[in-house]
């Protein structure tokens, strides 16, 4: 059997073994894991002499571990495993002649021993730590802990036990945490003194002898200190041993591994400070440990002082010391903020804070970002603390300037690209992302400083920006791009305190002192020669700032032509990332400055001509060589950015100063090449040429986007208030026709339908009611047999907006197209669903269908639904609404269905005949013959059908809302039919449901007595009582 197991493990781990044989071996080993007796074979394999190969022993012990964790080994058998492993450990780790296992095997044994500790320390293995400690001696007569292999293994288990029961970062169930707490209590009661003593002895005996042992011992002290008596670590004997290890930091040259010992010693102090205790006790302990002196000595040690700014600088040590500074300062500030801290302790904490300020600045201003990031939490805490003080006593804000200014200067310095950075290099994308994330965090700190002392912040940033632009004025392109980028970045952030309600100005005057200063900065930036901004980062920064502070140009309109010229230079940038971003920023700028741009369209259209050529690329194709895998370089992203140029052209061409005939000319000059391209690609697109279809999609999107630039109209608000002149509309009528021709030829293409739907929504803004005669063709192209439910829902939403915008002109067209249009919607609703997404889209389509009918009714077009042409469809409409009103699986749609039925009732039920009108309907309303009876016999039963469904829960919040809407429908029916409805309820409907006379009278009494709001509240509670 042993031989079989060994063979199986060897085959499974052999990369060159036959795959079928390997699969059999894997299956065999996996069966062994679940075999109740498998662990016994594997334990024997592991401890056997002579030893098997490492992989066999590793897998064998893994099987034992799996069996133990799966509960396949009973407590008595666990004792057998313990005895077997301890005998092995004494044989291998407690004899000088033995060869210890590899670190991998040692970790696996430590894992098994740790599991046995969890299972048996409280129940049968009380001598656990004594047994392990016996391994640390070469012989019983040894006077010190002299057995290195045994010590290493002991410390490995000690650290493993902490991971199992003490590590707060490990997620545990309530039962697991309770067990961990119980084990910690047992250790503290039985063995903690002994364990702590062993650490001292090991650190003393091996302080200069074995760096691995010392490092492991320090890690054990540092990890266990969080849950043991602090006095076991913070005592003179232990501290002397720790200081001895810290002294390694003073060495100029360390042997291999010595740096890890030194860093582990610093980490012990960090863990000591991090231990939970009262604020007063923490302050006293920081003073007792003399941490200020420790940090000072470490900061002045050769690795951090003499070697700073050289390649020998020890960043690991710097980050380790920074962690100690961070946690110490956080605790000092916590003590200062804690209301229960005594005045005496607060005074001590204040002194400590002043002592640690140089340390904060030292590591916060460190040239390595990972070191700086380590102390950001304590800097943030410090600034929040100072902010609270300044808020409670503004007079103190000035006193803190000596603290704030160095921090602010350090923040600004850290926001600068370092000398080794190469902006835009694809190989450095990860570094760039990390730097931008650091800038965000530093920006938050800057805002905190501004909140404490705004004037200090204003002056500091003004100095940086002012100095940079003065240097730029004198030296031009000689200014380091990093300095200019920093100034621009600070200007961008400055708006957080200068901009109010999106503007630098209020009634033409700067908002505040910050806005005044920013206006000065803007003036200096704009007056600089754009050719001095030679680096892509600064060119982007320039454009971003112009867009963010466009209100500056609204108050300095004389500067607009120069800025436009600068942008026109940059939109042809050779670097794609800059070029595509500039297209978006250009559109943003001209949109915000539209009213003040002037008649510059001819120049702009001419300058942009080569960038308006549309070239569709398939995502799988290679690019022109300068693409990257980042988002900006993707095919879709580049075309999306190009669309911003089309919109920008539309905006500039339609400014008030451009004559009407010129507007039409510019629109035609942009559209004509697109029309030609569509005509050229239509035939291959029909033949399913994928690239041609994509080209048509892009062309249609461009047409719609140009129209968007020409009109401010947003679908769903109102009919376009000021349509373009007739000559311009005529040009876009051609665009509409071209889109329809493409759509009619390619309506089977999802991407073409998507583009056409977008274009339709934008063309409305430039065509107004002129688009209405084309509406049947749009519907035919966009509501095809292959249209998804999602597409139908989106188009229904768009039609709602058309109805709202042109309700006075759409009746005839709507009358003609309603029946075929609704038939397509019904077909979409009736199609079977496959999967969750399909069900979501079906629910959305139902709701948009109801919203469409509501839009028709709300805009006084209800007559179209019951016109002679559409009368045959009316019953189907009602049937679908009845179905939705009874759907217990979709309360949202059911609620909307009842709302629609109420609207139908108030529209077609004639004038209210009860004293208290249900819906405030006017007396002039004309009743649809027979609709009153229809409401009573068809609509009223629906109010009871939903709650009668077995799965209906009347206590559900959404269900109550549906019932309230159903109550509203009943109140509407009563408002239109009066006693006729009361008699029907009393004599027929309610008794037929088995309702007793008393309940019937209660219900009809409430219906006739309560107003709409009152009955909407009554009906859900009535149903709830019936369901009880």
UniProtKB/Swiss-Prot annotation:
Q: Where does the signal sequence lie? A: none
Localization of this protein: Nucleus; Cytoplasm
Which molecular-function annotations from GO does this UniProt entry contain?
Answer: small GTPase binding; tRNA binding
Matching entries from InterPro entries are given as: ARM-like, ARM-type_fold, Exportin-1/Importin-b-like, Exportin-T_C, XPOT
Per UniProt, what is one Pfam family of this protein? Exportin-T
Its BP terms in the Gene Ontology are:
tRNA processing; tRNA re-export from nucleus
Note the SUPFAM superfamilies from the entry: ARM repeat
Q: Which GO terms describe its cellular component?
A: cytoplasm; nuclear matrix; nuclear pore
Q: Chief subcellular site?
A: nucleus
TM annotation in the entry = none
Which keywords does this Swiss-Prot/TrEMBL entry list?
Answer: Cytoplasm, Nucleus, RNA-binding, Transport, tRNA processing, tRNA-binding
The answer to whether UniProt assigns keyword Transport to this entry is yes
UniProt cross-references to PANTHER family, sorted A to Z: EXPORTIN-T, EXPORTIN-T/LOS1
| Family, as annotated | Belongs to the exportin family.
What exactly does this protein do? tRNA nucleus export receptor which facilitates tRNA translocation across the nuclear pore complex. Involved in pre-tRNA splicing, probably by affecting the interaction of pre-tRNA with splicing endonuclease.
Q: What is this protein called?
A: Exportin-T
